[in-house]
Amino acid sequence: MDGYVSKLPEICALAEKYNAVTYLDEVHAVGLYGETGAGYADQVGCLNKIDILNGTLGKAFGVQGGYITGNSTVIDAIRSVASGFIFTTSTSPIICAGALASVKWVKDHNDLRIKHQEQASKLKDMLKEVNIPVLENNTHIVPVMVGDAKLCKKMSDMLLDDYNIYCQPINYPTVAVGTERLRFAPTPLHTDAMLHDLVEALRKVFKRCSVQT
């Protein structure tokens, strides 16, 4: 929820040294990082060192479903014991076709990944210019820190009711008490004007709620 990334090269080196298994959750990275959208592990050159990797088709790819990769022994074990796999039906052929088309399209559009990072970085800079407390990180996640659950929900409601901006409040137990925040993830299609409108709305909401910035 902070938008941080792990030190994958160092972790993989330790795993290799001590014969440990590496498991990586790439649901927030697949499609968005790496030259072809393969994820953060690919971007930092560690993809072939990950033993088990899971991702989703429901975020960057905009469809439904998910996946787990690994060697044949691992995958056979998962198929045998994972209740989430055993007690569900297979994905619709229509969804599979849509997912395949989306993966192919995202793979060929690194320009959107570059633009995505530019817009996220730009939003962080704009927020800092008006003293809105944004958590520093080097990813596309933009956490605006509030620090109070009731206030976080109130501010989220105000953004929607008064400015037509939907933002999900992130409260305990998703994050620790005292670190509640509004969480934004701008896309490549969010224009500079849209980012400006968001920042201005947040500035007004923070002021109306008498939150110190």
Please give the residue ranges for each predicted region.
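PLP-dependent enzyme catalytic core of the Aspartate aminotransferase-like
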Residues: 161-162, 174-213
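Alpha-helical structural signal in soluble globular domains
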Residues: 7-17, 43, 49, 122, ...
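Thr-Gly-centered strand-to-loop micro-motif
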Residues: 55-56, 63-65, 89, 144, ...
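Conserved PLP-binding catalytic core of the aspartate aminotransferase-like
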Residues: 2, 6, 114-123, 128-164, ...
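Active-site C-terminal subdomain of aminotransferase-like
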Residues: 18-24, 28, 33-138, 151
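Active-site core of PLP-dependent enzymes with the aminotransferase class I/II
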Residues: 1-19, 151-152, 193-194
